[in-house]
């Protein structure tokens, strides 16, 4: 099989540059296009140079329709509005869409799922093996411990991150809620301030820290009456997520239309 031809969305950003480097280092994939927002000062610049690599002749462009004509997939870690715009084009072109964008609303996710009867989408709040293993463990622990154990999720990210809680924190919250057999939407405490009253039994709490250059730290604590258990993961470099996204794209190439997750990619769906 020939190399998979991939487009990097948000190619001028930090994650986009990491994705470009991951593709350059890979076996089995080549860069086919570099997408950037209309009006960006990055348009026209060489994607390789922006990523700290030799020039590769791929210029940043805002025209996804044109560049996707000869592509097999798109790696998308952008913002919700951009991702939703990309969904329709990727589905129309019949290319794999790997989505790592966070901050998506319920209606955004509904749009994404609406194309998966005819398109291949891999979507995850986190593309790393460690975090996906953590989510599997969190689900099991939440199921094993009763409601006398309160669940709290704490995440730390760099000062430039624009959404909170992080997609990974919400992913871990969904795992905990699934273990408890409850709806996260109905049992999430996303912020506490002032006189909040006693903690509501069964809820899942979130706290978000922002500062420095942290690539992503997450912990899930189960706090019981006589003991507490904390499970955690620390990301050392965002290349971790770039390599995970590339793995997802290569795995999805040739798959039947559907809505897949990193748990599917990593063989963790049944854990």
UniProtKB/Swiss-Prot annotation:
GO terms for molecular function: 4-hydroxy-tetrahydrodipicolinate reductase; NAD binding; NADP binding; oxidoreductase activity, acting on CH or CH2 groups, NAD or NADP as acceptor. It comes from the Bacteria. The keyword NAD applies. (S)-2,3,4,5-tetrahydrodipicolinate binds at residues 158, 167-168. Gene3D superfamilies: Dihydrodipicolinate Reductase, domain 2 (3.30.360.10), NAD(P)-binding Rossmann-like Domain (3.40.50.720). NAD(+) binds at residues 10-15, 36, 100-102, 124-127. It catalyses: (S)-2,3,4,5-tetrahydrodipicolinate + NAD(+) + H2O = (2S,4S)-4-hydroxy-2,3,4,5-tetrahydrodipicolinate + NADH + H(+); (S)-2,3,4,5-tetrahydrodipicolinate + NADP(+) + H2O = (2S,4S)-4-hydroxy-2,3,4,5-tetrahydrodipicolinate + NADPH + H(+). The keyword NADP applies. Keywords: Amino-acid biosynthesis, Cytoplasm, Diaminopimelate biosynthesis, Lysine biosynthesis, NAD, NADP, Oxidoreductase. Its EC number is 1.17.1.8. Pathway: Amino-acid biosynthesis; L-lysine biosynthesis via DAP pathway; (S)-tetrahydrodipicolinate from L-aspartate: step 4/4. It is found in: Cytoplasm. It holds the Pfam family DapB_C. One of its GO terms (biological process) is diaminopimelate biosynthetic process. GO terms for cellular component: cytosol. The active site is at 157 (proton donor/acceptor), 161 (proton donor). NCBIfam families: dapB. PANTHER family: 4-HYDROXY-TETRAHYDRODIPICOLINATE REDUCTASE 1, CHLOROPLASTIC-RELATED, DIHYDRODIPICOLINATE REDUCTASE. Catalyzes the conversion of 4-hydroxy-tetrahydrodipicolinate (HTPA) to tetrahydrodipicolinate. Belongs to the DapB family. This is 4-hydroxy-tetrahydrodipicolinate reductase. It comes from Bradyrhizobium diazoefficiens (strain JCM 10833 / BCRC 13528 / IAM 13628 / NBRC 14792 / USDA 110).
């Amino acid at each position: 099989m020939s190399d998979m031809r991939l487009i990097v969305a948000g190619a001028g950003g930090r994650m986009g540059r990491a994705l470009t480097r991951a593709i350059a280092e890979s076996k089995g994939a080549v860069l086919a296009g570099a997408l950037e927002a209309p009006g960006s000062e990055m348009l026209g610049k060489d994607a390789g140079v922006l990523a700290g690599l030799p020039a590769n002749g791929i210029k940043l462009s805002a025209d996804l329709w044109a560049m996707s004509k000869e592509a097999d997939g798109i790696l998308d870690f952008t913002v919700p509005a951009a991702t939703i715009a990309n969904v329709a084009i990727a589905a129309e072109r019949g290319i794999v869409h790997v989505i790592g964008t966070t901050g998506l609303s319920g209606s955004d996710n509904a749009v994404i799922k609406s194309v998966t009867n005819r398109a291949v989408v891999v979507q995850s709040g986190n593309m790393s093996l460690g975090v996906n293993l953590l989510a599997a463990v969190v689900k099991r622990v939440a199921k094993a411990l009763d409601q006398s154990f309160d669940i709290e999720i704490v995440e730390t990210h760099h000062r430039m991150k624009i959404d909170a809680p992080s997609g990974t924190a919400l992913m871990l919250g969904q795992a905990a809620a699934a273990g408890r057999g409850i709806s996260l939407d109905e049992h999430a405490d996303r912020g506490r301030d002032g006189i909040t009253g006693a903690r509501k039994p069964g809820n899942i709490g979130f706290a978000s820290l922002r500062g420095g250059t942290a690539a992503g730290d997450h912990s899930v604590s189960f706090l019981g009456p006589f003991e507490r258990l904390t499970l955690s993961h620390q990301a050392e470099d965002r290349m971790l997520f770039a390599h995970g996204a590339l793995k997802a794209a290569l795995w999805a190439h040739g798959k039947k239309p559907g809505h897949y997750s990193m748990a599917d990619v990593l063989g963790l769906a049944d854990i």
